[in-house]
């Protein structure tokens, strides 16, 4: 799951010696009958139970049942300990007791007096539970909440990267998220090394291959496109908008990687052709612009706004889903996303998104 909470090792040596004396003596060395009977075991403290649970959850001596018992005991002895509740949640997760795990993590998140980083850890753990139950949309939002509390939480970035790559196919966002995870993790960590050496290069190679296979990519003519764009700009100044639109369209055909051609074509068509075919053409051009510059939020917003205005609610939601992957705290994007969710009848997560939006104020 998430990185383990570090606790200082307790001084077990003296306790172990005492226990050996109490339970290891011979019959002849036993106390006289009239003397009080010595205890057979030494009661562990809450901190010791907690450390034992952590030890049993990881490492060579991993034992989930023993960890679970120790975690429950630690929580019983320290019911107000956020750390004990987090470890109990981890043990519950390992046993696939997801309801109990979620309750533990939610309790930590709800305690607003706790450090933001600790609450973020609980949210990441909560998201992992949700992923295990295939609640991917819920998990993504939970991870956004974690990053709002602690932008340097490497585990949150890592799990977002997994969701972007494996569930949503937002590969550009996955690269950004995995890079953040690698940057914030220990350099020698095996997962960090795998991200940097294998995962990120593989996604980049896939993106490059997809770009190379784009229609017209092999015969692109950037020079011709630049000339056509200049002609389009001259026509716009003369208010010959229809002619300018044709020039931008020709420029994009000459060079499918021309971001200015895609962006300006989308903008002009959306303003000047209100027919269904015009909306389709504008949305296609916006998608090209988005593919070429996936971090530019304005293109997502303009495309989604166009879809929303034409009652294409599901299209607006789809566009904004991708926008949010790159910038989950953009207020304007979120407001339109929530409105589109409501219009599309996507009520399952609507209240959760509204609550998240309130957290950002």
What do the PLM-derived regions correspond to, one by one?
Residues 25-28:
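Bacterial signal peptide processing site
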Residues 42-73, 77, 94, 223-246, ...:
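Alpha-helical segment of the N-proximal tetratricopeptide repeat
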Residues 61-70, 95-107, 133-142, 168-177, ...:
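Structural signature of tandem alpha-helical TPR/SEL1-like repeats
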Residues 77, 111-115, 149, 184, ...:
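Structural marker of alpha-solenoid helical repeat scaffolds
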């Amino acid at each position: 799951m998430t990185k383990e909470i570090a606790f200082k090792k307790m001084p077990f040596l003296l306790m172990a010696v005492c226990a050996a004396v109490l339970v290891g003596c011979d019959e002849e060395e036993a106390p006289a009958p009239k003397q009080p009977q010595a205890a057979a075991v030494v009661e562990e403290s809450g901190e010791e139970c907690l450390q034992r649970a952590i030890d049993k959850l990881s490492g060579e001596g991993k034992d989930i049942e023993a960890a679970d018992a120790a975690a429950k005991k630690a929580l019983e002895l320290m019911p107000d300990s956020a750390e004990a509740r987090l470890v109990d949640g981890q043990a519950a997760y390992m046993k696939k007791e997801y309801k109990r795990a979620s309750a533990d993590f939610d309790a930590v998140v709800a305690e607003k007096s706790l450090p933001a980083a600790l609450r973020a850890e609980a949210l990441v753990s909560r998201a992992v539970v949700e992923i295990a139950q295939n609640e991917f949309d819920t998990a993504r939002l939970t991870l956004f909440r974690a990053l709002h509390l602690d932008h340097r939480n490497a585990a949150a970035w890592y799990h977002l990267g997994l969701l972007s790559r494996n569930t949503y196919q937002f590969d550009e966002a996955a690269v950004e998220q995995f890079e953040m995870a690698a940057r914030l993790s220990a350099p020698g960590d095996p997962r960090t090394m795998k991200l940097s050496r294998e995962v990120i290069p593989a996604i980049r190679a896939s993106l490059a291959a997809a770009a190379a296979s784009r229609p017209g990519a092999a015969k692109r003519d950037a020079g011709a496109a630049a000339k056509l764009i200049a002609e389009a700009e001259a026509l716009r100044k003369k208010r010959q908008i229809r002619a300018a639109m044709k020039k931008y369209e020709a420029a994009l055909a000459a060079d499918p990687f021309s971001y200015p051609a895609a962006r300006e074509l989308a903008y002009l068509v959306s303003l000047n052709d209100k027919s269904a075919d015009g909306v389709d053409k504008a949305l296609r051009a916006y998608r090209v612009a988005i593919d070429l510059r996936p971090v530019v939020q304005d293109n997502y917003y303009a495309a989604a706004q166009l879809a929303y205005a034409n009652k294409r609610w599901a299209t607006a939601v789809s566009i904004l889903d991708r926008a949010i992957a790159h910038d989950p705290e953009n207020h304007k994007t979120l407001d339109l996303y929530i409105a589109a969710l409501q219009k599309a009848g996507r009520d399952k997560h609507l209240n959760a998104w509204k609550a998240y939006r309130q957290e950002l104020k």
